[in-house]
Amino acid sequence: MAEVAPAPAAAAPAKAPKKKAAAKPKKAGPSVGELIVKAVSASKERSGVSLAALK
């Protein structure tokens, strides 16, 4: 009584190649870093600005 290996499952159906995500258009306006620099420089606080104050 020789053991017979089970037959491999049927080959998975060929998957369609993944499409690349559509390139997102760049948003107009200043970058986040520029906005932070402007907010901190406009602040009158001498000790800096907290994260909560920036939001």
UniProtKB/Swiss-Prot annotation:
Residues with the N-acetylalanine modification: 2
InterPro entries on file: Histone_H1/H5_H15 (IPR005818), WH-like_DNA-bd_sf (IPR036388)
Where is it chiefly localized?
nucleus
Q: From the UniProt entry, list the residue stretches annotated as the region Disordered.
A: 1-28
Q: Where is the composition biased (Low complexity)?
A: 1-15
What are the record's GO terms for cellular component?
extracellular region; nucleosome; nucleus
Q: Where is the composition biased (Basic residues)?
A: 16-27
UniProt entry tagged with the keyword Secreted: yes
Gene Ontology molecular functions: DNA binding
What domain of life?
Answer: Eukaryota
The compartments listed are: Nucleus; Chromosome
Question: Which positions fall inside the H15 domain?
Answer: 28-55
Q: Which family does it belong to?
A: Belongs to the histone H1/H5 family.
Q: What is this protein's function?
A: Histones H1 are necessary for the condensation of nucleosome chains into higher-order structures.
Q: What is the protein name for this chain?
A: Histone H1
Q: Which organism is it from?
A: Salmo salar (Atlantic salmon)
